[in-house]
Amino acid sequence: MTLFEELKWRGLIHNITDEAVIDKINKGGLTFYVGTDPTGDSLHVGHLLVFIFAKRLEQAGHHPLILIGGATGCIGDPKPTAERKLLTKEQTDHNAKCLYEQAKRLFNCEMVNNYDWTHNIDILTFLRTYGKFFNVNYMINKETVKSRLDSGI
C-alpha cells in the first residue's frame, strides 16, 4: 500500500485537486507545515490528529515545519461562542517557545512564527496589498462568524 493509499484508507485525505500530488506524496522529500496558535504553553489533545498525520509524513521522508501563529495569537481568534482572551507579545513568545520545545521532541523540524513577517506591516499597506483577497460575503457566511453575529459577540 502506498503512503497516499494508506492516508486515504485512514480517512485523512478526502479528495485532491491535482493527481500529480499523489506521486509527490508517495515519493517523499516535500516540506509541509503544521500550524498552531500559541494560545497555551503546552500541546494538548486538540493537536493530536494533526501531529500524528505529520509524524506519518515525516516517517515517509517528508520534512515538517512548525508554523506558529504568533500574530494571530496576539490578535485573538474568533470562537463560535465567546471572545478569546487577548495575549501579550510576551505570553505568545513564551507559549511559542514551549510548543516548539515539545514539537522538536516529536519531529526533526524547524519553527517559523508568522509574527516575524507581519509585525511591521501597517494597516494601510495590509489592506491595500492583502485586503483585496478577502471576500466579506464569504467571511460573513462562515458558521463561526454567523453565530458570533447572531449572539452579538
Give the residues covered by each predicted segment.
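NTP-dependent nucleotidyl-transfer catalytic core
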Residues: M1-I153
